[in-house]
Amino acid sequence: MSFPKGFLWGAATASYQIEGAWNEDGKGESIWDRFTHQKGNILYGHNGDVACDHYHRHEEDVSLMKELGIKAYRFSTAWARIFPDGFGNINQKGLEFYDKLINELVENGIEPVVTLYHWDLPQKLQDIGGWANPEIVNYYFEYAMLIINRYKDKVKKWITFNEPYCIAFLGHWHGIHAPGIKNFKVAMDVVHNIMLSHFKVVKAVKENNIDVEIGITLNLTPVYLQTERLGYKVSEIEREMVNLSSQLDNELFLDPVLKGSYPQKLLDYLVQKDLLDSQKVNNMQQEVKENFIFPDFLGINYYTRSVRLYDENSGWIFPIRWEHPAGEYTEMGWEVFPQGLFDLLIWIKESYPQIPIYITENGAAYNDKVEDGRVHDQKRVEYLKQHFEAARKAIKNGVDLRGYFVWSLIDNFEWAMGYTKRFGIIYVDYETQKRIKKDSFYFYQQYIKENS
């Protein structure tokens, strides 16, 4: 069985990771500009000031996409490029950049898929509380609707947010991403304000009969209980704790998006641990219920699985620790586990109302080297091949999977890791900005031809 007719083969990037031009043509400062310019936040002090210089090289990059043969390109718009202060004053030059990019894509037969928020909040909004401030819902709405209304005739697929988990928890609990806050309660406020922002925009699109599809992208990680220890019987409490820890990664986001409520068991546990108060939980549930609206599709970013076991001395909010099974790992230290993608897709199909799904990111970082002007990234080719197979198997088993976007089109700024991790199927020499097509580029090009 090959992939269904019209299956959307694509590649993905994000504004801060590739654009550069951080303060050009009227762009405002974003939280990632601020965060990377502060010493000690990013490996080797790297920043995205120039990144892949896509802002000046978009024509070259679109011609590479055309050569690759992708049907769609997923990218994000930089809020601070359009509203330098987060709201109010509109920067026309910022809009003109996206006008050009979208026109180039359409002219080359590539469907633009736009992510409205991929982590680069205007710093001016962070100064008044950012995602933890309930007012953000209105600021985001103003920005999102401006972009949707401007491009609705050319852009038919919209993603409200990329990875709310990372925005909330990496940015506001673990503090390893911008804005670098370390407070679980604040992170939960962020989760909630993102959900309300998502609903408000989806509702406006539907109520105004705007002829587009709109969804959200969640990074989901299937969690497996480590049971392979000899003669070991798993107790009920162990199973429950591993399950609750999984809900913090997955259901905390999936449930409100697809069912209109947060997982109550998880919230009760957090109240019991004094990480939330019960009145707040009631308000959260009530507001999600009142504002809920079902999206047109779900985007899933999948990279690896998580294997966990019970450990009451873990010191984490759950008595759980992570196991690292023997096997193949990428440069990010992530296990290569394509079966996890299949398991995840089947679980969503069986646990949630039916919804079209796109894999909006999947890929791997390896230590790529240029040899004779080529990059022989055989491990990435294998990684992609195995995950395409898992996707195909899921479709065969009734999953309504409509498309797949490789992460990433091009090597780029990998957040806290700076430029040390390469995910692209196109290599970038950051000194010269020269692009080199990796072996995985040619593999993907051929695969698309054979499966379209």
UniProtKB/Swiss-Prot annotation:
Against PROSITE patterns, the record matches this protein to: GLYCOSYL_HYDROL_F1_1 (PS00572), GLYCOSYL_HYDROL_F1_2 (PS00653)
Q: Where substrate is bound, by residue?
A: Q17, H118, N162, Y303, W407, E414, W415
Its recorded name reads Multifunctional glycoside hydrolase
Q: Which organism is it from?
A: Caldicellulosiruptor owensensis (strain ATCC 700167 / DSM 13100 / OL)
Q: Which domain of life does the UniProt lineage start with? A: Bacteria
- Any known activators or inhibitors? Slight activation by Mn(2+), Ni(2+) and K(+). Slight inhibition by Fe(3+), Zn(2+), Co(2+), Mg(2+), Cu(2+), Na(+) and NH4(+).
Catalysed reaction, written as an equation: Hydrolysis of terminal, non-reducing beta-D-glucosyl residues with release of beta-D-glucose; Hydrolysis of terminal non-reducing beta-D-galactose residues in beta-D-galactosides; Hydrolysis of (1->4)-beta-D-xylans, to remove successive D-xylose residues from the non-reducing termini; Hydrolysis of (1->4)-linkages in (1->4)-beta-D-glucans, to remove successive glucose units
Q: What is its EC number?
A: 3.2.1.21, 3.2.1.23, 3.2.1.37, 3.2.1.74
As for what it does, the entry says: Has high beta-D-glucosidase, exoglucanase, beta-D-xylosidase, beta-D-galactosidase, and transgalactosylation activities in vitro. Has a very broad substrate specificity with the highest activity with p-nitrophenyl beta-D-galactopyranoside (pNPGal) as substrate. Active with pNP-beta-D-glucopyranoside (pNPGlu), pNP-beta-D-cellobioside (pNPC), lactose, pNP-beta-D-xylopyranoside (pNPX) and cellobiose in the order of decreasing activity, respectively. Very low activity with soluble polysaccharides synanthrin and locust bean gum.
Traced from the root, the source organism's taxonomic lineage reads: Bacteria, Bacillati, Bacillota, Bacillota incertae sedis, Caldicellulosiruptorales
For this chain, the family text in UniProt reads: Belongs to the glycosyl hydrolase 1 family.
Care to name a GO molecular-function term for this sequence?
A: beta-galactosidase activity
